[in-house]
Amino acid sequence: MFRFREIEKTLCMDRTRDCAVRFHVYLQSLDLGSSDPLSPDFDGLAYLRDECLTKHPSLGDSNSDARRKELAYAKLMDSDQRCKIQNSNGYDYSHIESGVLSGILKTAQALVANLLTGFESHFLNDCSFSNGASQGFKLRDAAPFKKIAGQATVTAPAYDIAVAAVKTCAPWYAYMQETYGDETKWFRRVYGNGLFSVPKNNKIDRAACKEPDMNMYLQKGAGSFIRKRLRSVGIDLNDQTRNQELARLGSIDGSLATIDLSSASDSISDRLVWDLLPPHVYSYLARIRTSFTMIDGRLHKWGLFSTMGNGFTFELESMIFWALSKSIMLSMGVTGSLGIYGDDIIVPVECRPTLLKVLSAVNFLPNEEKTFTTGYFRESCGAHFFKDADMKPFYCKRPMETLPDVMLLCNRIRGWQTVGGMSDPRLFPIWKEFADMIPPKFKGGCNLDRDTYLVSPDKPGVSLVRIAKVRSGFNHAFPYGHENGRYVHWLHMGSGEVLETISSARYRCKPNSEWRTQIPLFPQELEACVLS
């Protein structure tokens, strides 16, 4: 076991350089083929070279934090403006006949209506709070039980529904009456959601919105209902592997097209939702969504139906793309596999031209860089395949300078594009350069996703463990309100214990006692074993 000073010294290694940059420089020094997936001399390692630093915040021709945020907001406002135009002027018939589009939308409407049968009886069944920041609670106080115990926020149109939801849970109802009295004082009314951005790549951030607490609670209930119903037609939003497998199959024979959209969740117009959903479902979703946000001190009314951050946006967009894609397949008499996961769409290649025209007509813009309909490269849900070979790149999203960073980078290098249990021999020199920086005690692990040890053929040594404090009802006295919140949240969960975990930046070491499993090896390591 390391003494504390030795651990501290190891973790705070001053490399004076970013290992991510060193890795990229090494890749640039290699004589590689083309990074274009459609090129005859496509080389997966060249593809990795061009992709690995695209999300690094401070390299190449990257933009500043302020500029990335500004561009994200501008992109969101552009999508919102397009939605407003569609809400006023209708669909764009410049690339598709009005009769064809009307027929496809009518079939899609029938598919959605059938899918959502029984919504009015189940829309409150699976409501829940998220662990994310909201309009009422900062991230450090965003645990669901704290939102239940505190005075949650809600928009005026959703207030009565929020009260009705509380009354379905007797302990919650009793707590709200005891704490806040009259139901008109249970929640804090707010105008709408709050705009913010999260990192996407080194050029632009991704814009999203923090929803009011009770709006999110109700939105997640509606989203859960849609999610369950989509499973009945083969669309499982809890599992990305179906889309990933379809992408692999499409890369073998080119029979399936993978389509990705740009700003899909911000391009769902109010008009499209009105046309596709049953009136009572539309009315309910319209009440629990947020129609306004604050931008530069001014109240802004959304033209889009819901933003990223809304509790049902992902399920709603998935249902819309499923209905449109299925409608096109039925109208063309095409059978075959259909995969939907958010805006990751997989359809038979015969349907691709019509689907792209329909999507453009109803306000969605294809992401040309991530849409593959010809050749043998396919991408969906983070999976990248070329003729059945896994080409998924890994991304260095931050400077790789600490010990955990370097160990993770080494493990990603070893695990990239393995064939028959063998790692790419071209990467061994840079892997060894980084591995030599790591103390021998941390070598010998076998899980390539870990950043707590180095995966290598060595005998397992020790592993880093992040120090975290877990609070439960047995080792911590919660305030009265939080105790009530924990109980109500437990009733929502149905089982288990409601815990509060507080992580720190400190680590400790423990012996690596994992079961030893086979790991990918570099050919150079096999040669060394033979020679020894």
From Swiss-Prot:
Its EC number is 2.7.7.48. PROSITE patterns: RDRP_PHAGE. GO terms for molecular function: nucleotide binding; RNA-directed RNA polymerase activity. It comes from the Viruses. The keyword Transferase applies. Keywords: Nucleotide-binding, Nucleotidyltransferase, RNA-directed RNA polymerase, Transferase, Viral RNA replication. One of its GO terms (biological process) is viral RNA genome replication. It catalyses: RNA(n) + a ribonucleoside 5'-triphosphate = RNA(n+1) + diphosphate. The keyword Transmembrane does not apply. It holds the Pfam family RNA_replicase_B. Residues 245-375 form the RdRp catalytic domain. This is the catalytic subunit of the viral RNA-dependent RNA polymerase complex. This complex is involved in viral RNA replication that produces (+)-stranded genomes via a complementary, (-)-stranded intermediate. Part of the viral RNA-dependent RNA polymerase complex, the other subunits are probably the host ribosomal protein S1, EF-Tu and EF-Ts. This is RNA-directed RNA polymerase beta chain. It comes from Enterobacteria phage GA. The lineage of its organism: Viruses, Riboviria, Orthornavirae, Lenarviricota, Leviviricetes.
